[in-house]
Amino acid sequence: MAGYTLNLNIGDNKKRSESYSKTYQKRELEEMTTVQLHDICTRERIIKGITNTLNRHELIETILRFRGEKETLFIYEREEGGYERVEDIIKRKLGSQLRDEGTIRNPAKLIVYSNLAMSPNDRYQVEIDHQKRDGVSKAVVNHLGESNVLLISEDNELCGIFNLVSDGAENPKYYLAKSDEIPVIMAEHRHYYLMFFEKKESDYLYSAYYDLERMPAAVLNYYKVPLVEIEIREAEETDAILSIDFGTSNTTAGAYLDYGYISKPNEHDMLNGCIKLDDINLVTFNDTTRDDRPWLPLLPTVVSVADCSNPEKVKYKFGYDAQKETKIKYYDETFSVFYEIKRWANSYNAMQEIIDKKGNVTTVPRYTIIKKYLEYVIKTAEQRFKCKFKILHLTSPVKLKQQYSKMFKEILSEYVIETDHMLDEGTAVVYNTIANLIEKKRYYDSEYMQALIIDCGGGTTDLSSCSFMIRNNSVAYDVNIETTYENGDTNFGGNNITYRIMQYIKIMFANYYSKHESIRLDELIRIPAADIFRYVDEYGKDKVYEQLEAAYEEAEEIIPTKFKNYENHTRDEYFMVKNNFYFLFDIADKMKKQFYMNEGIIRNRFQSNYDDENEDLKITRIDRWNLVVKEKGRLIYHHDFPDVIFNIKEVELLLQADIYEVVNKFLNRFFKDGTLNNYSIIKLTGQSCRIDIFREALKEFIPGKCIEFKQHSNDSASIIELKLACVKGAIQYVNARKIGFTDVNLNYSMPMIPYSVTAFTHENEEIQLICSLDKVVTAGYISRNKDIRQLELILKDGYGKEKFRYNYRNEVGQYRPVTYKEIESMYKGYIYQEDTDNITDREVKFFVFATADQWGFYVVPITRTGTQLYIGKEEFFAFENDIWEVDFFDGTK
């Protein structure tokens, strides 16, 4: 069975010569237009495709004939009867042993875990020389590449199935890999071999294993190379705690591995530096979206649906694999892709419709998708560290600590979740600082320090304050930490910055394609850069972007991106517009990273190669240009790169008002009441905080004061380090508690709520029940007639703008008799006796209050009949939900 895959090179910053011939895969070519196929024929000098008039299908076949690359068919997922079918082939169809003459060299020793996968990260390299002289007369040539490999005994008995995997480099290295689903069965022999096959024979084994239709094969020729030693182990359960920072855009994980975390650590991994004992170990993930396939400590929080034909066994792809799937067709297929699943914390029991590429549709609970993603992270950690974790520590936003704790316990019930000592993300970052202060002995004993933490993540930005004290009591360090959530913006994060850049890009391209001219940003934002902060103070952020937003709406008529508006158009038009949004959002994100991950970039443009790059002009490399432009009412693809250049000064001007508005919203209260100077540490975390505008905005409130922000060069390593501060702090915290060096006392104060909750009286008077940014007024009540069936409550932001309306349904049949003592035991501090004593017979009082441990508010109704009090059902309403939160991927942008 022949098959094909696509290997895109989007975002690869490595400069390559364009002179070498590229190979193409059928799946990639099928996504291209006829114009693009002709361009390939010209670029690759495929004469038949240039001189002959060929249709699209003929062009694809011609390119595949001369530059085609078939995919590797790996045996990885277990299939009933597959192992036995391969055994049968070895017995019946094994042909001649080919001479390798030392061109294939196995690793000295294999350590295989029966209950774990083997990955290229294990670095079991098979060295392959594709042409080598035998020292006498003729050249020995093997044609080995990515393929299936069999582990056999000396009498050719099948013992296991492995994969030979390339690292993706131009001069590739090959590593052994193995699925955890396919067993290794050791025979009673001393000597074992790896049996290698060239592509044709390897594909035949694949087809046999999965019982697919295959061409008859007379014999299977093979290379047989001895193994010096192989050892089979079973991964042990460990007491080490796996810490996970489940992020909106990216997730990280790691553990502190001491010398006794398992009885027999993997010697091979320690030699290679993959496991470091008595140290923090971070889980690395293979970035399969890039040609060089690096191993990174970040996993994108993205899930795609691979196959939902069987609703009981839905197959998903996670992280980089999901991103790779989404890039293959730029979203003109109808399979489900989920971003920002962390936002589902308040609705994780809701049902979610999913669809795969073949059009199969089913529904699953949202918690299933979150669970599968987290299990993938855990499984990867177990594979990296060669153990089985039973104890997990998961950080969460400080304001949603209880909600996340509840969700994690429910969906990961087979693990022990450290909820009693669960750190929030801000405190984890601060503990990273505390641990470093203790290690370097730079703290003042028994003296309190105060810190402000601004965390600008992928989807949200939060402000929390933290006061801590370190005391050395001669037995251990006593660390007292008190944390308060101070403010936040659930709709501002790295994605907002990307979207703002996308708006500018779209406007620029719309002018280029419609008028063949560029437009300067100062024509869209007419306020000088030096006056932006003052202008926001006086008129607000929206006034700054008024003309830009209007120009963006006009650009929609030329480069449409609001694909939700095209649901009543043809399928092709819908996907062309959807392609536009994701294409522009993707390249905006790449340009953002280019500007803020590389020092000295002044100008930037998009191009397919680096030919025009110099010290002044940097290239954001895009493999192919796919932008749809509306011309005379028709949507037309454009594949030529536009001659448009962006500069850093314009991008900085573009983002100034957005970033200052958030910083002003967070710090203005502290600045006005004079408490800002009490903070000795101001910590900026999250990858978006690398942007200099954050620090410039902070200086507006902290004149002359040094902001404690670790200065790194703006390279990818330091950007990643910002994200790792949280998971490293969590690992240090759980390890310090485990070994008894530190006694940590955590306290959480009543959070500052950036929302108000109001309701209208029967006289149409609006009253505040919960006041914004007020720790005192966090409870109130409103009275209604006893027969009320529904109470409407209004949520407003700190500026008084309505965000959402809640409806509490008053179920008369659910009231029960109650005494005030019972009420006090349940709601002490929220419902007072004087407020229940004056309830009349025809009145029901709805008590509305927020608590320190839940990010939302409760509604509790109490009524009276004679002297008897009755209490109705308690209901919790979250402040934030996915109904009113901004979703950049909903087709309305």
Say what each PLM segment does:
Residues A381-K388, V398, Y404, F408-Y448:
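Hydrophobic, small-residue-rich alpha-helical packing segments that form membrane-like cores
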Residues Y259-L298, E447, S474-N487, K710-D715:
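Flexible phosphate/Mg2+-sensing switch loops adjacent to catalytic phosphate-binding sites
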Residues E231-K264, E333-S336, K342-R343, I438-E482, ...:
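Gly/Thr-rich phosphate-binding beta-strand-loop-beta motif of the actin/hexokinase/Hsp70
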Residues A2-E77:
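Basic helix-extension-helix modules of the SAP/HeH family
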Residues I370, T498-Q503, I507, E546-V744:
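Helical "lid/coupling" subdomains associated with nucleotide-phosphate turnover
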Residues E77-S202, I275-L392, S396, K406, ...:
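Phosphate-binding loop and its immediate beta->loop->alpha context
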Residues I90, L94-E234, I619-R624, I645-E650, ...:
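Acidic low-complexity intrinsically disordered segments
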Residues R214-T238, H421-I454, A725-D743:
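Conserved phosphate-binding catalytic cores of ATP/NTP-utilizing and phosphoryl-transfer enzymes
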